[in-house]
Amino acid sequence: MYSNIELFTMIAIIVLLTKPLGTYMYNIFEYKPMRSDKIFLPVENFIYKITGINPEEEMDWKKYALTFLLVNMVMMIITYFILRVQQFLPLNPTGAKNMESSLAFNTVISFMTNTNLQHYAGEDGITFLSQMIVIVFLMFTSAASGLVTAAAIMRGLSKKTTNLGNFYADFVRITVRLLLPISMLATLILVWQGVPQTFAGKVVVDTLEGGKQTIITGPVAVLESIKHLGTNGGGFFGANSSHPFENPTWLTNMIEMLLMMLLPTSLIYTYGLMINNKKHALVLYISLFVIFILLAVGAVYAENHPGVAYSKLHIYGKPYGNYEGKEVRFGVSQSPLFATVTTAFTTGSVDSMHDSYTPLGGAVPLILMMLNTIFGGDGAGLQNIIMYTILTVFLTGLMVGRTPEYLGRKIETKEIKLIALAILVHPFLILFSSALTVMLKVGASSVTNPLYHGLTQVLYEFSSAAANNGSEFAGFIGNTVFMNIMTGLVMFFGRYITIILMLAVAGSMAEKIPAPPSPGTFRTDNAIFGAIFIAVVLIVGALTFFPAVILGPISEFLSMT
């Protein structure tokens, strides 16, 4: 009962914030005059001046995509070398060593792609300086990269020009006007609730037993805010948001979930304003929340009713649920709700150990990452939603014998080939990598559980990497050379191939002259379209991943009953 109240309270707050924040992002993307210009314009102009950026330069989709890639590659190279020499740099109170080459490769790709898959423990694997100028820096820039490429795609679908904007100007504006202000406010709230923000490093305390204990602190709050606002997910500590210094109270737990949901939901309203069709955006908004609520309720129910196998242990049962791997302060209801939010919005932070969930409870976050469309992360999620929207319109047009049109522009062979390729990249990366891992001894050695749960561990690892989520079944051994390279490549291709293909779709659609709606135009702003959209998302996901899910969590569930 409590979890349902929390779920719908959280959704109500997000719904109230969607319109004002969505409008604000629209004004940022469209360069509208704002009252805050007197604060932000001088900062932006200073950045343009010292970097030599010309914010008036126009870019077509090819130049926008190339600039996006080059900027991201440069940031990855610089941060890679910082991690490789971090022990020789200042602000290293914990004595962290230089990061091993394959782990550094995995880490910089992980954070630059907004995945934040962590094969290291933050307490001793990385310095305070690296936390700030590598981890936090990439958390801001990866979120900004996703948001501005989404803005470029929205312009391509809504404008009568092939100019998709200026990557540099978009990047600066979204960072200065959106990510930094909200992160600063969230940081202050988290500090108020007890999250550390200090350079003190180690604190040695006397325990009740008379011994000594070393407690690691650090600049945690500033990381924690952008970690969730930017749908990043990487933790300052190895235990992530289950650690009391990252997530000390039920209020911080709620705030972190709200931060994860804030930008992806509001971006759908921004999309409605950009295409001048708020009803269409509302249909997408409701459709996605329908799927999200059903899966959230399912996850909470599965963890509260763990089944016969748990009841026989005489420590679990209907009154208590599955407490294994969960923090007592969050319990068996808040934990799966957090797991649903973190995988639906591709953040990847965890306040409980997903590897300890029941088979069906663990299947929910796995399915959300496989679908990779239920809101998703900052910017990248909207791109996937648009991808499935165009596919839905195309399939519907084929069924009724009409030429498919979206926003007045015909969907032709070129666009649908690009869309099909973008959709296929995600399952190919997951299934091929999972199959290769279980076939090779060097990969199978990372699996720590037999039979069905072991396969689920592998599927979860690569689903998380391909979806740019970053959460893990923590029992899986990720920090090996093979897994660092494999997941690094999956994260890289899962991020950049899809974004570039969607920019190409936007560029192709921008070249077409939009036609006014006719009586034969399939409407995308009613309940019929919403139902078909849900069906397409679920059917495509089911057909692609159903055999693997059957062999993993569903078989494990059946074996326990």
From Swiss-Prot:
Disulfide bonds: none annotated. Coiled coil: none annotated. It is found in: Cell membrane. GO terms for molecular function: P-type potassium transmembrane transporter activity; potassium ion binding. It is a multi-pass membrane protein. The chain crosses the membrane at residues 5-25, 63-83, 103-122, 133-153, 179-199, 255-275, 281-301, 380-400, 418-438, 485-505, 531-551. Part of the high-affinity ATP-driven potassium transport (or Kdp) system, which catalyzes the hydrolysis of ATP coupled with the electrogenic transport of potassium into the cytoplasm. This subunit binds the extracellular potassium ions and delivers the ions to the membrane domain of KdpB through an intramembrane tunnel. Belongs to the KdpA family. The system is composed of three essential subunits: KdpA, KdpB and KdpC. This is Potassium-transporting ATPase potassium-binding subunit.
